[in-house]
Swiss-Prot record:
Negative regulator of class I heat shock genes (grpE-dnaK-dnaJ and groELS operons). Prevents heat-shock induction of these operons. SUPFAM superfamilies: GAF domain-like (SSF55781), Winged helix' DNA-binding domain (SSF46785). HAMAP family: HrcA (MF_00081). GO terms for molecular function: DNA binding. One of its GO terms (biological process) is negative regulation of DNA-templated transcription. Keywords: Repressor, Stress response, Transcription, Transcription regulation. Gene3D superfamilies: 3.30.450.40, Heat-inducible transcription repressor hrca homolog, domain 3 (3.30.390.60), Winged helix-like DNA-binding domain superfamily/Winged helix DNA-binding domain (1.10.10.10). This is Heat-inducible transcription repressor HrcA. Belongs to the HrcA family.
């Protein structure tokens, strides 16, 4: 977004309006700024500065108030050019560390629990709605496959992906099959597929297994179902969300229709995943070694999120990349959100690397 260069006074007043509005949820007037902040400016001078900010679209006046509130443009300027992000609070750091570092042996090998824990802790500490997207698995490496026989013609295929995720699918066969034939198929699959990405398996499995002789019916069922068995998109159904009460308790969302919109949005896991994923292009701030994306109001790609800000950061599990973030009102404490999201992303990367 392009802006004109704000003067020092304009930056100071805009920053104060945003910081005050974040705390009080009330429009901010020139008299409040003159009385509570030592800027060395008169009420009249502050009024003039606010008039210039309003004329340029950084703040606006609600219908029933003499004060002003930030616009999306004002928040964006603040995030890009005024906000100063410090290190995470030691107490909050300790709370996160206690749930990850001290429990790493307990969580080892159970990535679903790691991601669920991250969402719960982040929601509690940020006091926003926390969202954790599992890593994209299109470039994930297949590790092994097992088949559990549920009945004479019914099996459950269990696929382990890079020691991090397990996918299960129940299949009905056209005829009964023995355990011996199942084991023969499993042995061949675990000999020829490990080290391939799911995408590579989907596109080449038929030719890789074309010379197999033995349990052809089961192997043919595996090959014909490869697009489903080795499809990564269903992993998004495991989106982890926590802290719904944090967002619906905000003054901005007290009206019943707003609450309904929020709940509907949260229940749409694919829509939520797209929202967080698509937050990346709008603005990136370098914090430590992670890029934190901040998408504000109308920058979000759905009308239901026009009153929300999304702060997110990537985390890493081997070569796979997921995202962790928070959603809340545009009137959020941006510095705090960036700090805790960034730190949580680092903890997730460390925990999942430990599982790998």
């Amino acid at each position: 977004m392009n802006y004109r260069d704000l003067t020092l006074r304009e930056r100071q007043v805009l920053g104060i309006i945003i910081q005050s509005y974040v705390v009080s949820a009330m429009p901010v007037g020139s008299r409040t700024i003159a009385r509570n902040y030592n800027l060395g400016l008169s009420d009249a001078t502050i009024r003039n500065v606010m008039a210039d900010l309003e004329a340029d679209g950084f703040i606006s006046q609600p219908h029933t108030s003499a004060g002003r509130v930030p616009t999306d443009k004002g928040y964006r300027y603040y995030v890009d050019l005024i906000m100063n992000v410090s290190r995470i609070d030691e107490e909050e750091k300790r709370m996160i560390d206690d749930r990850f570092s001290n429990r790493n042996s307990e969580l080892k090998g159970t990535s679903a629990e790691v991601l669920g824990t991250a969402a719960r802790v982040l929601g509690s500490i940020s006091r926003q709605l926390a969202v954790v997207l599992p890593p994209r698995l299109s470039n994930a490496v297949f590790e092994r496959l097992d088949i559990v026989q549920l009945a004479s013609s019914r099996i459950m295929v269990v696929i382990a992906i890079q020691s991090l995720f397990v996918k299960t699918i129940v299949m009905e066969l056209n005829a009964e099959i023995s355990r011996q034939k199942i084991d023969a198929v499993v042995d061949v699959l675990n000999e020829r597929l490990p080290g391939l990405t799911l995408e590579e398996i989907r596109s080449t499995i038929a030719q890789r297994l074309s010379d197999f002789k033995g349990s052809e019916e089961l192997m043919n069922s595996i090959v014909s179902s490869a697009d489903t068995l080795f499809d990564e998109s269903s992993i998004l159904e495991q989106l982890y969300v926590s802290g719904t009460e944090n967002i619906v308790d905000q003054p901005e969302f007290k009206q019943p229709e707003k609450v309904r919109d929020i709940i509907t949005m949260i229940e749409d896991k694919f829509g939520m995943a797209r929202l967080v994923d698509n937050a990346v292009p709008s603005a990136l701030r370098q914090v430590s070694e992670c890029e934190v994306a901040i998408s504000i109001g109308t920058e979000n790609r759905t009308g239901k999120a026009a009153d929300l800000t999304i702060v997110s950061s990537p985390y890493f599990a081997g070569k796979m990349i997921g995202r962790v973030g928070v959603m809340g009102p545009k009137r959020m404490n941006y510095e705090h959100a960036v700090r805790v999201v960034n730190y949580m992303a680092g903890c997730l990367s460390e925990a999942l690397s430990g599982n790998n």
